[in-house]
């Protein structure tokens, strides 16, 4: 085996059982990985110098093919209602077969870190057969100082071989695609998919498992910090405005997707961004556009024209086109990835039913209720006049990545909110004046004005009313914001129709929460819509 590149000589891939590989390249930089990826026929150069790769059959995550090893230590710590078990015996067969498959191959290794807080960092080794995957994960995680690589020792290893096909009968899995996590031994095996996001989300899943045991809250959120050191956390599912609203020229971006909240404050898990690229434009998102069109960035499933110019409006490969770049490509990004305890928590939702107000203040119990609910609404479609929205509840605003029971995360969040006196707000970026198809999208100018007032603390001084349906506190007015949108019922042409729609949404919340009722105390149960008085 020929090993090249800076690494710990006592910690080579042979220690992982990969000694039969033909060549192993450790910790190559961007230029080197570009050369390998292009020479291997994996990717091509765009007109502006980004590296474009296509992933074939898999253009998104494969949640149905993700497994967690069920052993003595995970038996009672994993939320098995939401995680598929794999026996240690099946995992061992899978490991042996993947190692055998790697024999004679060229492999790429990156030694990286998950977590900007040294006390809670997860040193991670990622072994890939694709050079562009190596660049992707190098962009997404935190790069240790080069001089430390010769002594690097990982706590998590990811082995990703897209050309490996799992055998459901032999390995106890669902298909030829597999993402198998052995949380006890810190090993993730990925096969049968080239979608690069599996690498990133595997690190997130492991951190989400390890950190709560240390009293650290892992969060699927974006975060920023103001000039006075006042940090804010933005929870929200896809399409709610998490990335857009946390990108504020007056505030420093900590990160756009995954963070921890520990003893000293919040910290980014990552060192990069994995931005959606569909319909990306220099007018709407100039910073992301600039970061996307430059050397060092990986474009995933973005269509190029004959001159190698990316067409960000072309969704012929997938709607889920992506751009992966290091955080320092964004001008206003934090250099440390660390900030103090949050002053404000924002929970974003895009309510297509047109019921929720543009902003509401939450008690700690209401915050836990809405965190466990993880609500947003998707528009079913516009064809043939279909206008009925579809409610989506993804607990903790990231159910696919939460190995433990949601109540563990919810209780930890509530405890931290109380301990640090954090102001919590629910922000609706969805529809006003009616449901989707009748009403209109919440004006972004109004959302930003309300958000700014919440972040500066000015909104706390407003007068509030108690929402008749949800029991949270809604401001009556704010300078520069049309008072009508603060009262959703008044924006509907038919008040009775609003009441019926609100009742319908309340019942969806209540029905969804039944699975959590036995895991929370009476104060959180009483925070259900229509039952609790507003925040003081």
Curated annotation (Swiss-Prot):
Cofactor(s) annotated in UniProt: Mn(2+)
Binding site for Mn(2+): 201, 220, 257
UniProt-listed InterPro entries: PEP_carboxykinase_ATP (IPR001272), PEP_carboxykinase_C (IPR013035), PEP_carboxykinase_N (IPR008210), PEPCK_ATP_CS (IPR015994)
Catalytic activity: oxaloacetate + ATP = phosphoenolpyruvate + ADP + CO2
Binding residue positions for ATP: 201, 220, 236-244, 285, 322, 447
Matches recorded under Pfam families: PEPCK_ATP (PF01293)
Compartment annotation: Cytoplasm
Main localization (coarse): cytoplasm
Co-factor binding details: Binds 1 Mn(2+) ion per subunit.
One BP annotation, GO: gluconeogenesis
One Gene Ontology cellular component annotation held by this UniProt entry: cytosol
EC numbers for this chain: 4.1.1.49
One example GO MF annotation: ATP binding
Binding site for substrate: 61, 195, 201, 322
Top EC category: lyase
Keyword terms, alphabetized: ATP-binding, Cytoplasm, Decarboxylase, Gluconeogenesis, Lyase, Manganese, Metal-binding, Nucleotide-binding
Pathway: Carbohydrate biosynthesis; gluconeogenesis
Role of this protein: Involved in the gluconeogenesis. Catalyzes the conversion of oxaloacetate (OAA) to phosphoenolpyruvate (PEP) through direct phosphoryl transfer between the nucleoside triphosphate and OAA.
HAMAP family, per the entry: PEPCK_ATP (MF_00453)
UniProt similarity note: Belongs to the phosphoenolpyruvate carboxykinase (ATP) family.
Protein name: Phosphoenolpyruvate carboxykinase (ATP)
Organism, scientific name: Agrobacterium fabrum (strain C58 / ATCC 33970) (Agrobacterium tumefaciens (strain C58))
Lineage: Bacteria, Pseudomonadati, Pseudomonadota, Alphaproteobacteria, Hyphomicrobiales
